[in-house]
Design a protein with these regions (language model features):
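C-terminal scaffold of the Radical SAM
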Residues: 2-6, 24-51, 58-381
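Local cysteine-cluster metal-coordination motifs and their immediate loop/turn environment
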Residues: 13-26
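Short, low-complexity intrinsically disordered segments enriched in A/P/G/S/L with frequent Arg
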Residues: 306, 414, 425-427
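Short amphipathic alpha-helical interaction segments
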Residues: 380-395
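A short, conserved structural fragment
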Residues: 393-407, 428
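Ser/Thr/Pro-rich low-complexity tandem-repeat tracts
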Residues: 408-412, 421-424
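Minor-groove-contacting beta-hairpin "wing" of winged helix-turn-helix DNA-binding domains
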Residues: 432-438
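Short, amphipathic alpha-helical interaction segments positioned at domain boundaries
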Residues: 439-453
Length: 453
């Protein structure tokens, strides 16, 4: 169910050393002073964004990502969160996450995190095999993970995620199984497990193009993925999204916003935003940064919103901040939000429906058919008439299912004219229901999800 509460993402683009597989907007600082200059600019952006977006809105999740946010000093983190609380209304029970590299954590930093209200720690472990960590270019080793995990528990963190990677060169199933066993023995509340993605522009991509990068086969990656799901389940973590498992009530609320088409505001270098209500002053985006494009997208989104009594049902606008550090700092120095107006685009109805389904199918709960109807004013199979045959085939193959709210399975798309005119699915004609992938269907998720975008 889409809610009105905002998610806030804060980007810290610095790291100690760029990993050779990393395609994110991050790099080691160019000088000792650059981090301080960036934090000062970020604090100013938070204040400007609070004036532009904050009135009347409240945020229930905050996610500080990177890069490696834990490279910041305690005073810098405190400055950022002081500005955040001065500029935005944070709900009484927020989820506030910070990403951390075990090689950069100290007791002092962890205490500062807790003092700032950060209540969720996401540790970039990746592997618990030192040889693999070295190949990945990571600055930490296995012993650092265990010592930092203990420090985090001692500091009062009761919600910890461990990030792991599979499909890596030299990573046998035995090594992966050992990593899973040792990670889960720590009893984290959340486990993320991602296959290695070869990103263009990275050293790993160059090795791949030159035929010098060992890769796991697709079949091997599938086996490793299911190993993670099974191991996590045995440890009491429920598989709730393709690459994530969590204890009950510990699903990542912020990331669920991305997978549920809820609004999020990105702050910092290159940060992305998705908002349904955007009404910025004319100087919010500088002319040379694409103010005309941004204003057109804003007007289109506003016109669409006027047709909806329920704001959560309307389509939104997507854009990102300036990705060049000099450009980002320059915009803020001139008193303008660092928005890259040329990136702004208002969703069409087709875009919005496709993204809704694509992201919802990442979740094990799948597409909430009642919520889809509420958002778009039409049933799922009315919106995607071509999907009827696909869904029937996927059901026959055991790749997908339609279930009612009570958990009972529905054979397939409705066949009667009356049902088709209303919603085209028995699950939609009753008290709601869900269209979701089965565990087997997750292996074909990319093929299935691509049918809707």
């Amino acid at each position: 169910m889409i809610t009105n509460d905002l998610g806030i993402y804060i980007h810290i683009p610095f790291c100690v050393r760029k990993c050779p597989y990393c395609g994110f907007l991050s790099a080691p600082p160019e000088s000792e002073s650059q981090i301080g200059l960036y934090v000062d600019a970020l604090v100013r952006e938070i204040g400007m964004a609070g004036s532009a977006y904050g009135p009347g809105r409240q945020a229930d999740t905050v996610f500080v990502g990177g890069g490696t946010p834990s490279v910041l000093e305690p005073g810098q983190i405190q400055k950022i969160f002081g500005a955040l609380r001065d500029s935005f209304t944070i709900t009484g029970d927020p989820e506030i996450t910070i990403e951390a590299n075990p090689g950069t954590l100290t007791k002092e930093k962890l205490k500062a995190f807790r003092d700032c209200g950060i209540n969720r720690l996401s540790m970039g472990v990746q592997s618990l095999d030192d040889d693999i960590l070295a190949r990945l270019g990571r600055i930490h080793r296995k012993r650092d993970v265990f010592s930092c995990y203990k420090m985090a528990r001692d500091a009062g963190f009761e919600n910890i995620n461990l990030d792991l990677m599979f499909g890596l060169a030299g990573q046998s199933r035995k090594i992966w199984e050992k990593t899973l066993d040792e990670a889960l023995a720590l009893e984290p509340e959340h486990l993320s497990f991602y296959s290695l993605q070869i990103e263009e522009g990275t050293p790993f991509y160059d090795l791949y193009k030159a035929g010098r990068l060992d890769e796991a086969s697709d079949e091997e990656e599938r086996r490793m993925h299911h190993m993670a799901i099974s191991a996590a389940e045995a440890a009491g973590l429920v598989h709730y999204e393709i690459s994530n498992s969590a204890k009950s009530g510990r699903q990542c609320r912020h990331n669920l916003k991305y997978w549920s088409m809820e609004e999020y505001l990105g702050l910092g270098l290159g940060a992305h935003s998705y908002l349904r209500r955007v009404d910025l002053s004319e100087d919010a985006c500088e002319e040379e940064k694409g103010a005309d494009e941004f204003n057109r997208a804003e007007e289109k989104s506003a016109a669409d919103a006027a047709g909806y009594s329920d704001i959560t049902g309307c389509r939104g606008i997507r854009y990102n901040n300036e990705e060049d550090m000099a450009g980002y700092l320059g915009s803020i120095a001139r008193g303008a939000l660092p928005v890259d107006g040329k990136s702004a685009a208002a969703d069409t109805e087709k875009d919005a429906m496709g993204i809704y389904v694509f992201t919802a199918l990442r979740k094990r709960s799948g597409v909430d058919l009642e919520d889809f109807r509420r958002c778009f004013g039409k049933g799922f199979f009315q919106a995607f008439p071509q999907a009827e045959a696909h869904v029937a085939r996927w059901q026959e193959q055991g790749l997908a299912e339609i279930i009612t709210d009570t958990g009972s399975s529905v054979p397939g798309p409705a066949e009667t004219k009356e049902e088709k005119s209303r919603s085209s699915s028995p699950a939609e004609t009753k008290e709601g229901g869900y269209f979701r992938l089965t565990e087997k269907g997750i292996d074909k998720s990319n093929d299935i999800m691509s049918e809707f975008v």
